[in-house]
Each structure stands twice: as C-alpha cells, then as structure tokens.
Regions:
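Conserved hydrophobic residue
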Residues: 35-36
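Short, Lys/Arg-rich nucleic-acid/phosphate-binding segment
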Residues: 39-45
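A short, Lys/Arg-enriched interface patch at domain edges and termini
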Residues: 52-75
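Acidic, glycine-rich loop-and-strand cores that form catalytic or ligand-binding grooves
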Residues: 96-140
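Leucine-rich, amphipathic alpha-helical/linker segments
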Residues: 68-89
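Glycine-rich, aromatic-bearing surface loops/beta-hairpins
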Residues: 124-245
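Basic amphipathic alpha-helical segments that dock to polyanions
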Residues: 25-32, 47
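Polyanion-binding surface elements
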Residues: 1-25
Length: 245
C-alpha cells in the first residue's frame, strides 16, 4: 500500500504539476475529511483507490488550489448522463440506450456500478483495475496511453471518460460516459404534463469562464502500480516538477 506522500509524487509527476501544489491539494482534502487519515510509522495512512481518485479530481478540476475541496464535493454528487435521464425522464427514453453505458463494454467492475455511481466511483474502478494489471491488458499494445481520455471541467460540473481500444479492424470497442450533477431537474424543465421544456432565456449573460483539463491513461497506470507496490517496474518519469524516485 502507498502513503499519501508517495501518491502526491506520482500524481505530480504524471500530470506535470508542481509537487508543492499537489501536496496542498492533499492537505486540504485531509482536513476536509476527504482522504484516509492515519498516524505515524506503522500506523501511517495508506491511500486507497478512492483517495487517489479524489486527489486526481481535485487537481484536474480546480483552477485554484483553494477550490479543490469544493471540486471534489461537487464531483461526489454526480451521475452519468444516461442513468440520470432514465431516472428522471422514464417516459422519454427514445435514443437514450441503456441506463448504464458501461454495461456493454465488457469490464464487469464498470458494468456492475449502480445507476447512482459518481464520476469518482468510476475513476476509482479504473485505478483498481490498473493496480491489478488488468487495465493495461484491456488497453492493448497499440498506443495504450491513448486508449483512455478523461476530461474534467471547472467551475461547471461535467466530466467525461472515453475508452477506445483498437487491436485490428475486427476487434475494437469504445464507450463514452458523461457525468454531471445528480440533482433532479429544475421545475422549469417540465410543463404541467411533465414534458421537458427548453431552458428560459435570460436577460443577462453569465461571465463565468469554464475550463477543462484532459488526461490520458498514464496517470491511472502509474497510480495503480504504486498501489500495487510495483511502481519500480515502470519507466522512471522525470521533469521540472518532480521525480518519482
């Protein structure tokens, strides 16, 4: 099992972030009760896949470090778009497909996620698969890092996980899961019969600027190797930000 400090180093190195910045994200999550606590020595905290998923989300989805805790709390209140639609608009399902977009992709742990699972839950599953050595096998040998694209938006709550595996022309599959707020639709979205309506026009413009960050599979694979105690088996990453070892 890995320590929080080791996780910070891996995330900083694989995302190209300053280690001090990621350390502050981790400290803020600890204070907010969003990261596993522990003591010193043998009782020191050992991070979990969910700890790693929360720290990744904090770093990716926050323009400012001080926003990290709020970012994680927002993404802990998300739901995949198809599941949300099936739950709140059961009479308007034409073209929506199944409520769990992961169901036909072929990874049991993702397919068995409940409808109410969050973006962070899905991210934790991918990290667990990486720690078991199964994610790299799933991605194949053809540009495996590019088999996954993860986008996190701020301050708007929207994240996307895309997976595409191509081995040859007759062996390829893909999935895209979009996560937004799990709140029920606002009242303006339905008329008296329950039919969904377009949003009302506004007289003012919201000046907020949405930002999004994209990453590939590399951070997941390195975090998984760290949790499995196999980080030394992967190529060393060095840069201006930090070094893994």
């Amino acid at each position: 099992m890995a320590t929080p400090g080791e996780l910070v180093k891996v995330i900083a190195a694989t995302l190209g972030e300053d280690e001090a910045t990621v350390t502050q994200h981790d400290r803020n999550l600890l204070i907010a009760g969003l990261r596993t606590k522990g003591g010193r020595g043998r009782s020191a905290a050992k991070v979990t896949a969910h700890d790693a998923a929360r720290l990744l989300t904090s770093v990716l989805g926050s323009h400012r470090v001080r926003d990290g805790v709020d970012t994680v709390r927002r993404y802990l209140q998300t739901q995949e778009h198809h599941a949300h639609w099936h739950q709140h608009h059961p009479d308007e399902l034409r073209g929506m497909g199944k409520p769990n977009v992961w169901e036909d992709y072929g990874i049991p742990e993702l397919a068995s996620l409940p409808r109410e699972h969050t973006f962070i839950d899905a991210l934790a599953v991918l990290i667990t698969l990486a720690s078991e050595g199964r994610l790299i096998k799933e991605l194949g040998d053809f540009h495996p890092f590019e088999g996954i694209k993860i986008i996190v938006t701020s301050p708007r709550t929207h994240a996307r996980i895309s997976m595409h595996v191509f081995r040859h022309k007759d062996d390829h599959k893909s999935v895209q899961a979009d996560y937004g707020s799990n709140e029920p639709p606002s009242e303006w979205m339905k008329d008296k019969t329950g039919k969904v309506l377009p949003p009302p026009t506004r007289a003012t413009v919201n000046p907020r600027l949405d930002r999004w960050v994209e990453m590939n599979a590399m951070p997941l694979l390195y975090i998984g190797a760290l949790l499995a105690g196999k980080i030394d088996e992967l190529p060393k990453i060095e840069g201006e930000c930090t070094s893994l070892r």
